[in-house]
């Protein structure tokens, strides 16, 4: 039993250190951005496939209906980090109906990717702070799943390096996180 707890904590610590290193590189501009054209639909499908076991464990229903390729212009590796952080965040906070819906909308040469999860909305006073390093809305609940308040600050650093929009919107039945990418 103790060995499992130690291994679990070591894994959490390892992930946190890796995330901190990545965030540090992003914040200090030491991480090169490699812009390329890639299919965002395929990237999201791949992230969802890699999180299949976690999705099953959380008993979440993930809805992603896009099948046709949608090409965007960005750093594919970094966009994968953004998608992974948003989906992990949704999985950690999904509640009530346990539905996560991912959508891609296209307008004026921009693709907007949204990740919505049912559950409790983020208190309005906390919304501006969720992008800050180590900020946690619910300290007690975050401990349950091992959140460390770094994921959304990584999203912020990546999207700032792209010069593109991102954000979070409360709905009565959950929260929607979004980001935008150029299609040309």
Regions found by a protein language model. Give the residues of each.
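Short alpha-helical segment of the dimerization/phosphotransfer core of two-component systems
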Residues: 8-13
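Conserved catalytic submotifs in the C-terminal HATPase_c
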Residues: 34-38, 56, 61-71
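Short helix-loop "hinge" at the ATP-lid/N-box region of the Bergerat-fold HATPase_c
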Residues: 90-91
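Short beta-strand/loop element within the Bergerat-fold HATPase_c
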Residues: 97-109
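Short conserved segment of the HATPase_c
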Residues: 122-136
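Short alpha-helical Gxxx[C/S/T] motif in the catalytic ATP-binding
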Residues: 146, 151, 155
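Conserved glycine-rich
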Residues: 163-165
């Amino acid at each position: 039993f103790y060995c499992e707890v130690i291994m679990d904590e070591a894994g959490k610590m390892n992930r946190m250190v890796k995330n901190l290193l990545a965030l540090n590189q992003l914040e200090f501009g030491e991480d090169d951005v490699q812009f390329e054209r890639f299919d965002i639909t395929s990237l999201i499908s791949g992230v969802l496939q890699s999180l299949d076991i976690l999705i099953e464990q959380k008993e979440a229903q993930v809805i992603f209906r896009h099948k046709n390729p949608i090409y965007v212009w960005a750093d594919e590796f970094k966009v994968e980090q953004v998608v992974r952080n948003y989906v992990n965040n949704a999985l950690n906070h999904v509640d009530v109906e346990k539905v996560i819906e991912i959508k891609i909308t296209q307008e004026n040469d921009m693709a907007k990717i949204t990740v919505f999860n049912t559950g409790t909305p983020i208190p309005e006073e906390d919304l501006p702070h969720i992008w800050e390093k180590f900020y946690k809305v619910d300290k007690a609940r975050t401990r349950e799943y091992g959140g460390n308040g770094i994921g959304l600050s990584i999203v912020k650093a990546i999207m700032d390096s792209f010069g593109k929009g991102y954000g979070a919107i409360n709905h009565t039945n959950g929260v929607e996180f979004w980001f935008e990418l150029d299609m040309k």
